[in-house]
Regions:
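Intrinsically disordered, low-complexity segments enriched in Gly and acidic/Ser/Thr residues
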Residues: 314, 322-421
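Post-signal peptide N-terminal segment of secreted/secretory-pathway proteins
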Residues: 55-182
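Acidic, serine/threonine- and glycine-rich low-complexity intrinsically disordered segments
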Residues: 205-366
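Beta-propeller fold detector
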Residues: 72-85, 126-140, 193-218, 274-283, ...
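Repeated scaffold domains used in trafficking and secretory/extracellular systems
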Residues: 84-98, 137-153, 215-229, 284-297, ...
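Beta-propeller blade signature
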Residues: 59-70, 117-124, 178-200, 251-272, ...
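Bacterial Sec-dependent N-terminal signal peptides
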Residues: 1-46
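Short beta-strand elements that form the blades of beta-propeller/WD-repeat-like
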Residues: 39-54, 100-111, 155-175, 235-247, ...
Length: 453
């Protein structure tokens, strides 16, 4: 029965594509029908298998595709752990999708194949066809790269890393380290851009990334970077950053320190040169995110989530001047009426309304050892946020490793399932806030779903 469903759906989408091709060469006599057909697309669901512990996702990644119509149909059921396509990756794969959903991009994470880039044509079900050639970015950014697909028409990917080295003044006695004095920590950023269409390395640069002299003297340094985002002009990249600190007196890690304003690295694109660091006075903590894209371009500005803020996560705004707009104050604690909101993954539709996964201080730890998560609908212009009540929550449902939402017009598709338990795809109409329960997601012990593409 499932195979029949898959074959018919594949044939249906293929015929739809043929009809669209023919309609482009003839007079448009039925625009309503054409627009309706263009709304259909593949939705790919990713499932992360347990390794040693529930929810660790270290047992590998499987993907399964269904049409957007079937994803919205709660009578459908898919079992990616049993019938999915195994994505090459030693641990949880880092996935991206083309804007139309027809291509999946993967860079293997860790292990012997870590850093290998590959892409697949989506054909439905477990049928993903490798296309193009593979290329490794490991020589540039290591075998466990943090990478993202830029929103430039599916042309470019970008991966980053940062390495650090504490620096000391030896007081003129290079052979005696007892009188050495800590001065600062050197942070070296590497970034590689990847031609996604032709599987080629486009550019690679390494640069020193500095904070203010005062911040560095106090022991602060950039320790992790992630999630490059292209600005509206296409001439700057914004890279999220996390700060760490050492005690200048001992050069030992300092875990009890003042959290500084959120920071972002800005560098020229496509040259990848001239990095500078900008700071927010609205949000504090980190901007590098974790597994999902943490900042998005909307209406000429880039909107970015922060994490680790003692006042809860904010949505921050970087305007066309490539600086934080500190007049834009969007506190999720205030909007949601919670304390300690922490953004796990979010994604806006083109209308500036977004679905956001979060936890807060009231979340209880589940079987994975991580706190329960929730979903909210937020509005970037109105600066409002409302918890989505059409989704069943329970303590074992957490989104710490969540990677992606699928956007289809004003609809946003998400996966929601507790660790080790069945769940469903849910579709959020961002215009109305309505939530539609979609296809069932069949789970297995200790495993979880990490998003839709």
């Amino acid at each position: 029965m499932k195979n029949q469903f898959f074959n018919l759906k594949t044939i249906s989408l293929a015929l739809s594509a043929l009809v669209l091709t023919v309609s482009c060469s003839e007079d448009n006599t039925n625009p309503t029908e054409e627009e309706k057909q263009e709304e259909s697309r593949w939705i790919t669901v990713a499932a992360a298998k347990m390794g040693d512990n529930p929810g660790d996702g270290n047992g590998g990644t499987l993907i399964y595709a269904l049409s957007s119509d079937d994803a919205k149909d709660e009578t459908k059921s898919i079992a990616p752990f049993d019938n999915g396509f195994i994505v090459p990756s030693n641990r949880t794969a880092r996935l991206q999708a083309s804007e139309d959903g027809n291509t999946i991009f993967n860079i293997s994470y860790a292990g012997d194949t870590g850093g290998n880039y590959s892409k697949y044509t989506v054909n439905g079900g477990q049928n993903f066809t490798a296309t193009g050639s593979e290329v490794s970015i490991a020589p540039y950014v290591g075998s466990a790269p943090r990478w993202i697909k830029l929103f430039d028409g599916d042309k470019t990917g970008a991966a980053v890393y940062v390495s650090t080295e504490h620096q000391f003044n030896d007081n003129g006695t290079p052979d005696d380290d007892t009188d050495d004095v800590y001065t600062r920590t050197e942070a070296t950023m590497g970034i590689v851009t990847l031609d996604l269409e032709n599987s080629l390395i486009k550019n690679f640069e390494e640069s020193s990334v500095t904070l203010t002299a005062e911040e560095e003297a106090q022991g602060y340094y950039i320790s992790r970077i992630d999630m490059p985002t292209l600005n509206a002009a296409g001439d700057k990249l914004y890279i999220g950053a996390r700060l760490s600190k050492v005690d200048p007196a001992t050069a030992e890690r300092d875990n009890d320190y003042e959290i500084l304003g959120a920071k972002t690295i800005v560098l020229d694109y496509p040259s990848l040169l001239n990095p500078t660091v900008i700071s927010s006075s609205i949000g504090y903590g980190n901007t590098n995110g974790y597994r999902s894209i943490n900042s998005f371009l909307y209406n000429g500005s880039v909107y970015q989530a922060n994490q680790g803020d003692s006042n809860g996560s904010h949505i921050l705004k970087i305007d066309s001047s490539n600086a934080y707009d500190n007049s834009y104050d969007f506190s999720l604690d205030t909007a949601l009426g919670v304390t300690g909101a922490y953004v796990l993954a979010w994604r806006p539709a083109a209308n500036g309304k977004a679905v956001l996964a979060y936890r807060h201080d009231g979340s209880q730890d589940g079987i994975s050892g991580r706190p329960e998560s929730y979903f909210a609908l937020i509005d970037l212009e109105a600066k409002t946020a409302t918890k989505l009540e059409g989704i069943p929550y329970e303590v074992d449902m957490e989104m710490f490793q969540y990677q992606s939402y699928a956007v289809n017009g004003s609809d946003i598709y998400l996966t929601a399932a507790p660790v080790g338990k069945n769940g469903n795809i849910y579709v959020v109409d961002t215009e109305t806030g309505d939530v539609t329960k979609g296809a069932e997601l069949v789970n297995v012990d200790g495993s979880h779903f990490i998003g839709a593409w």
